[in-house]
Amino acid sequence: MHIVHTIAELRQQLSGFKRPAFVPTMGNLHEGHIALVRQARPLGDVTVSSIFVNRLQFAPHEDFDSYPRTLDADAERLEAAGCDVVFAPREKDLYPEPQTFKVHPATDLSDILEGHFRPGFFIGVSTVVMKLFSCVFAGMPTGVAAFGKKDYQQVMVVRRLVQQFALPIEILAGETQRAEDGLALSSRNSYLSPAERQEAVHLSRALRALGEAARAATGQPDLAALESQALQALARRGWKPDYLTVRRRADLAPPQGALADVPLVVLGAAKLGNTRLIDNLEI
């Protein structure tokens, strides 16, 4: 396995290949990332993973500076998973000058949910994804890129980006990997204290309960009331929830009318202590 830091080094390593399988990450890897590498690997002729903590998607008050940087351990895990090339650019490598050209995704998808509570987040995500795609796939006839469904809205934004720019890239959405108690694996789980780690599973349980209540309702359910009850129940446990909501899988819009035949997803984000966690469940 090769570890490279510059775009020129990356392209040199990829010369001669025609279909990269790419897994972008911010490092501090867990089994969810490794599962994506294993799923993507058979779909390309070379497997690439990037490790880059992207400043553009962090607000000034968020955890950019404290986000764990664990390159050596991450590289060991990626090599064991069969990764061929690790692209670990420094900030000066990916952004040698201020990134004044940015990708602004459609507001109907990017200004809701995560985008509402983290303004500018999806601009930062879309910009770095487009830049990484340019680094990995430039000159390639086709390729595949893998993202985890835990970041459900992000996957949808990336799919729209690929569609709108006619990029010859297949997007693979990997299922959320969970701990035995149901907690979605996340790099930020490492912030949790032992007591918070025990409590953290209640986010996925709240989403499951909300989804079951929505599906059990006959006719046109009062989703606002069900969502409010779910928020209050989580808050009583000491959480600070941003949202717990039922949305259509197709576009993340609130469903209208009866829900019987509508593919839905329940999404949630809440802060436990100083750690903000997100999760979702398709129902």
UniProtKB/Swiss-Prot annotation:
ATP binds at residues 26-33, 148-151, 185-188. It catalyses: (R)-pantoate + beta-alanine + ATP = (R)-pantothenate + AMP + diphosphate + H(+). Keywords: ATP-binding, Cytoplasm, Ligase, Nucleotide-binding, Pantothenate biosynthesis. It comes from the Bacteria. GO terms for molecular function: ATP binding; pantoate-beta-alanine ligase activity. Its main location: cytoplasm. Belongs to the pantothenate synthetase family. Homodimer. This is Pantothenate synthetase. It comes from Polaromonas naphthalenivorans (strain CJ2). The lineage of its organism: Bacteria, Pseudomonadati, Pseudomonadota, Betaproteobacteria, Burkholderiales. The gene is panC.
